[in-house]
UniProtKB/Swiss-Prot annotation:
EC code(s) of this entry: 3.2.1.37
Organism: Emericella nidulans (strain FGSC A4 / ATCC 38163 / CBS 112.46 / NRRL 194 / M139) (Aspergillus nidulans)
Gene Ontology MF term list: alpha-L-arabinofuranosidase activity; xylan 1,4-beta-xylosidase activity; xylosyltransferase activity
Key words of the record: Carbohydrate metabolism, Glycoprotein, Glycosidase, Hydrolase, Polysaccharide degradation, Secreted, Signal, Xylan degradation
InterPro entries: BXL, Fn3-like, Glyco_hydro_3_C, Glyco_hydro_3_C_sf, Glyco_hydro_3_N, Glyco_hydro_3_N_sf, Glycoside_hydrolase_SF, Ig-like_fold
Temperature note: Optimum temperature is 48 degrees Celsius.
Pathway where this protein functions: Glycan degradation; xylan degradation
Family that this chain belongs to: Belongs to the glycosyl hydrolase 3 family.
pH dependence: Optimum pH is 4.4.
Gene: bxlB
GO biological process: arabinan catabolic process; xylan catabolic process; xylan metabolic process
Subcellular location: Secreted
Designated name of the protein: Exo-1,4-beta-xylosidase bxlB
Amino acid sequence: MAVFKSWNLALLSSLFIPALCQSNYPDCTTGPLSELPICDTSLSPLERAKSLVSALTLEEKINNTGHEAAGSSRLGLPAYNWWNEALHGVAEKHGVSFEESGDFSYATSFPAPIVLGAAFNDALIRRVAEIISTEARAFSNSDHAGIDYWTPNVNPFKDPRWGRGQETPGEDPLHCSRYVKEFVGGLQGDDPEKPKVVATCKHLAAYDLEEWGGVSRFEFDAKVSAVDLLEYYLPPFKTCAVDASVGAFMCSYNALNGVPACADRYLLQTVLREHWGWEGPGHWVTGDCGAVERIQTYHHYVESGPEAAAAALNAGVDLDCGTWLPSYLGEAERQGLISNETLDAALTRLYTSLVQLGYFDPAEGQPLRSLGWDDVATSEAEELAKTVAIQGTVLLKNIDWTLPLKANGTLALIGPFINFTTELQSNYAGPAKHIPTMIEAAERLGYNVLTAPGTEVNSTSTDGFDDALAIAAEADALIFFGGIDNTVEEESLDRTRIDWPGNQEELILELAELGRPLTVVQFGGGQVDDSALLASAGVGAIVWAGYPSQAGGAGVFDVLTGKAAPAGRLPITQYPKSYVDEVPMTDMNLQPGTDNPGRTYRWYEDAVLPFGFGLHYTTFNVSWAKKAFGPYDAATLARGKNPSSNIVDTFSLAVTNTGDVASDYVALVFASAPELGAQPAPIKTLVGYSRASLIKPGETRKVDVEVTVAPLTRATEDGRVVLYPGEYTLLVDVNDEYPTAKFEIKGDVQVLEKFPLSGNDSD
């Protein structure tokens, strides 16, 4: 190891200085690289990549296995930073840089994924991703970014305490799967052989803990049953591989059933590449940042750096976000822990993806290479960001028509969020052109505005209460802007409580005693327990806005004033605050059991507000096109290479706006089959959804909801994915007053998939 570090010191010393911007595209015209087949566009991407890898020395190969790949000055291969982020817009992270002012000093900052998830609008997801990838390519063309992006995060948001739940679309695996299909499709484009950018599905697998009870994500061993893997943790990742053909995956920090994810050949090879067929020549796996190192230093799965590097490479990791592969693969090779063939295969996958992206091709003839500053933060993008903020807003309470607000008058804006800007963005964000505060948004609408924060997000001081109560007494209506921000929830920071932090709730309830119309706008990715506010007659309305980002002020006030009608739905369950005392975060089981009351709407019944909840400024009547559908033949539904994607039927609803306000309506369709499959059975399962746009008062709209086989299946502990014949009940929305419908699947039990088990699966 000492010998390896000495001959590689010069490269390593420059390799890991934080990059300010990306290197230029390779010179395939006049430079030394132009003499190599990598620049020959008549060859296949795989052939071109293999030719480059074969031209590299062992030292050069090893020094291109980290995220800050050194390239080869000898060959004219520029350095490349693989670590680029674009969770909800081009983000200021490592491989991405922003100017201090002028061109490329900002990008469109869309609302956080949890807000986009609350919109339940697949077309909206794709359009957002398309704009993000356009801006990403513009940044790349100006040497401010790369052309691969480590997004999306599709770990289902199972535990309300998880600090990174804000990065996900929500808790339901079908919802996450549909999100990722559209988001990856929007980022990469429609041609898998020539992607717009490379997307990266993360974090494989069973990752939803930062630090809890003295256990951190770096050493946590997630004990997960085969049933929960197949029904909950893996479906979004399977969609990434099978349906979306994502370009890259990221393995997670945690171990899965005893094996660190980035050292788990079963997970990365047997499941991902072989069982799911994710074997494209340009498909690659990166470790999460520092995850390869932590195979040794936190999991103690191996004893040395070379062993950790070898374990990752041999498991199927192609790239290290960190230093362990470039630091230790040389010694691993000398010890016989890796083969040159395995190293070459990893690099070939990486460079094949760059060839497919046009990285080595002339700019002429590549429309994407002409994108520039004029294509960033366009008026269309800004309007779309506002649309997402509006469509993802969820109305949780509205008594006596507290909302929409009356025009004009005096508003008292109270709460810690009234003057926030970047705090509205969530994490993994880049600079936005402008983020108006709630105060600014209200003043633009012509209101007379009185302001007093009253308290801070997590403060127990009541020093500001008197000022808040004083302005409230002078106002026509009160709006409290509060909730949680990234000082309470974020990467590396899980919550220990899920009630309102600090004394925000105390202040809200004091305001509620004044007899003025009071609206509470709740920010944050995770939910807080609103029980006291829902029960208070003095709290007229509650609105969840999540992290609405650059258009948050305008979008929120469009909803508050009635310019836009709320129609978003909670993409996660709102649990009572006592829930955190009932189940440890380290318990990965979904089903109820000892010290576990059950997780998500499928298994938990005592929610404060359920998954899918959301009110409107109008009323709707919903009925089924018919009371019974089908029957459907089980064997027919089980046909094909990927039967889980087969369509069962398109179920039609008649949705009538019986109120006075035009409004969108999200039709959520659940199925229940309590007698079928292993017991206990889920309470219900989301099987489809569709968002209808602007249904006018008095209008009846036909809303079609397509249902595939996947959400109807159940898994067994021996790894079978099964479709059971029998009767299924369809439920719409979370309104028990809406009628149900039924359908029947006839025939024999069908095994759709035989999932390979590792031998380490949790019982």
